[in-house]
Amino acid sequence: MQLHLKCILIASLYAAGCHQSNTSNTANTTDTVTAITTTEAATVTSNGTTFKKQGTLAFLGKSGADTLRKIDIQLAQTDEQRADGLMYRKSMTDDQGMLFIFPDLEERAFWMKNTYISLDIIYIADNMEIVSIQKYATPLSEESLPSYKKAKYVLEVNGGFCDKYHIAYGDKIAYQQ
């Protein structure tokens, strides 16, 4: 019995010593564990929600030639995925975002109900040009955040992302799955 307890104690100490800690002062980062499959990566954050990498997205300057920033994206393509969005997530890293893909081009409006992190909501036309940005959306707010222009895509990234990386109206995006 004592040998069994010693083995458990040694295994516990070993596991505690293997834990990696993220010491960044950024409020939107967490300790993560990444699992790679043949087609996508899933990042499980410390609060248990899962970010599934389903593609990459590049922010391009107005000319489309200069890459301003690249991020990993999770896609929201079905009605259910678009309705859930980033609800209930407590964190997201700066190199992640969610791209909502709609079947049509029309004015959009998002809200922050059940969304715990501040977001920049980027509205994008069918020609991949950014037509509107709602910056620093207030967590848990039910206020409507309209696009004011027709959009086929909506990208959600951490609040302050657009200011930090100089993303602006007229810039373009390119993404691949």
Roles of regions detected by a PLM:
Residues 15-17:
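C-terminal motif of bacterial Sec signal peptides marking the signal peptidase cleavage site
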